[in-house]
Curated annotation (Swiss-Prot):
Belongs to the glycosyl hydrolase 2 family. This is Putative beta-glucuronidase. The lineage of its organism: Bacteria, Pseudomonadati, Bacteroidota, Flavobacteriia, Flavobacteriales. It comes from Formosa agariphila (strain DSM 15362 / KCTC 12365 / LMG 23005 / KMM 3901 / M-2Alg 35-1). PANTHER family: BETA-GALACTOSIDASE, BETA-MANNOSIDASE. It is found in: Membrane. Pfam families: DUF4982 (PF16355), Glyco_hydro_2 (PF00703), Glyco_hydro_2_C (PF02836), Glyco_hydro_2_N (PF02837).
Amino acid sequence: MGFCMKDSKQYYKSSIGKSLKRSNGYLKLVLVLYLIMVSWSGYSKEVFNSRTKENINANWLYLEKNIKDINLALNDANWESINLPHTWNALDATDLNPGYRRSGSWYKKELAISNIENNKLYQLYFEGVNINSEVYVNGQKAGGHIGGYIGFTIDITEFIKSGKNDIVIRVDNSYDPEVIPSQKSDFFIFGGITRDVWLETIPKQHLSELKITTPKVSENEAELLATVAINNLNNSNLKVQANLLDAQGVTVVSSVFKIKNNTAKIHFRNIKNPKLWDTEHPNLYTLKVALLEKGDVIDSVQNRVGFRWFEFKDHGAFYLNGKRVLLRGTHRHEEHAGVGAAMSNMQHRKDMELIKDMGANFVRLAHYPQDPEVYKACDELGLLIWDELPWCRGGLGNETWKTNTKNMLTEIINQNYNHPSIIIWSLGNEMYWLPDFENGDDTDKMNSFLTELNDLAHQLDPSRKTAIRKYYEGSHIVDVFSPSIWSGWYSGSYKSYQKAIDTYKKEYPHFLHAEYGGSSHVGRHTENPVTGEGKIQSDGWEEEIVQTDVANIAQIGDWSENYIVDLFDWHLRISENDENFVGNVQWAFKDFGTPLRPENAIPYMNQKGLVDRAGNPKDAFYVFKSYWSKEPFTYIESHTWTERQGPKDLARDISVYSNCPEVELFLNGKSLGVKKRDLKVFPAAGLNWNLNFKEGKNTLVAVGKTKENKTVKDELAINYRFTKNGKAVGLKLESELLENGNYLVTAIAYDKNGLRCLDYEDQVYFQCLSGGETLKSQGTPTGSESIAMANGKAAIEVKRDGKNIPVVMMVLNQNFKGTYLTIE
């Protein structure tokens, strides 16, 4: 399978007519036009429409039945219309009734092909199907694929006919111990055709498997070496022409290369003064390759190229293009509220842009390869990638498991080989945990297979590093290793972080810290976050597999936003001030679904994200932005903490997160002074004030000033009371009309005096009894029928059903048996 073909463009015929007027002026004009065309295309003559690529996401039918036989499936009457991408787990994986479906389903589409060309191959390209699939064309099995998260091609040439063609696909995400990832992984394995599908036509004599390397790169000169396979059915006398174009489309270098053993080696040795690809300036070139027969272009492909080199110094820092770069990273799971893993390209792109806007330069794609749009965005935005084989937990499997796993690694590397953003091929995460097979945690056997994978990765791609996370016994096998450091969450205090990284910098030659952080429930705050001091051992940082006998913040903490803000602030202060540290990778950028966490504040959600599942930033997002982003901003902690209480004249801490050199804070129009930002000071790099609120409404304004004397400001209104609430005696409901026409229904816990109970955290349950429906199963702070209160408050979005009757809402829990609200 030629992964380069997914980015190939169509080339158009450019020829000069033979019946030209022989006037001298006309010949000059023709010559000029010809030279312009040649300089633009690099080719003497191009064949019109040599390749086509058509997106066929629209107008599919879906059958949610686990039927094995295709004929029984086709005769079923329950097919429903859908568009791709699609997952049947979009709305069943979270909330009150998860019903996480792991089973088989069917998809079908009528595909019209008007005229079949005998000199063309026809193929379907699937960007990703979870997790096993069988593809049928006009009733015949054309192929299939084992394993999700990877693109694959099905040649349908011999199965199609002119006119209408029936494409039928069986997809199955059932538990299969022989296919990674393990069911014990802490994320949902979404079933379905979760990415784009394409109909492609290519010439029977064609190019494939374009692999590009840059063996030598410096600021002054670069070398490009590429190989491309040729399918030469007719044993014709073919050649390959290659053009390297810069970002403006100008040809930098061009040459014609011979073909030997159906392979062409493209070698450009002296590319002068290349514009380097890095995280600040992700300069990209384009390599265009044409297959020539007697001077005519019969096929052509193209791929982007980035010139860069990198190095992990032994027991030291990371260098990109000879300059030290601190890896400022996060993790990304491929899912979004309401659609699960069936995200649009726009949603993928928005995720990556938000990560970049935060100031990150590195992303670990966990725990599986992701949509092609993600890699494309990282190439363009300047985000370095850790790409991961989904060997996540489950230990070592049988021989079939091993074959499937090696095949998947091969596919990942071949498919994503040409992306300059990728620097690491990860071979797994927590692989030894909870084996699915007998003796699956045998260290010697694990290491033997890990060595096979490591050798395979280096054989397929000698230019990049291999890595694993949290399998200590195999740390010596791979190039880069991440131990488990969860200071302040699964073990110890966050103040142990410096000791942890100092320990591992000495122990592992190439140490990159992947995964740290903790959960936060949007809107939950406390004046005195639980830090564990005096209750837990402060020096720990390792995450235990079984935590029933472990005291840690994950279990005894309050899940407040302000605790997590402090945790990240401490970690970033350490990493930003350590000159010999490679960097760290926060877990995870966005809240994501998991079958292992039904008891969480939002059921079945891992809430360690810097943004919620819909992409809305939490407080912690702005902590990272203050350390990493260059775009000036200020953010007062916290915009989700607007109701506070405490005794009169008791000073409260206010932190401002900003990347400006200095910030001035105003309370109710009065300046509280200017403070200088100092990255060595905790918290908030010294942008912290003690102040006294008045009773009632208070207005805070933070004004940041840049080095150029430009100002940016943030404003926050806080309602403060001197009376502490008592115990909750009931729940009340309120509604607000939103701009989209829906209602936000909010439940508030109150005491006997009617005060909102800011310390009430119990779970509540929403239900729409008539007149509408809740936007449930979103896994967001306003999209879950079951949710824990945050400072005595919880909400859900409700949509009218169009029947012109009042909306009747109910909220209840074990203590408060039912409160009702009617919205006319």
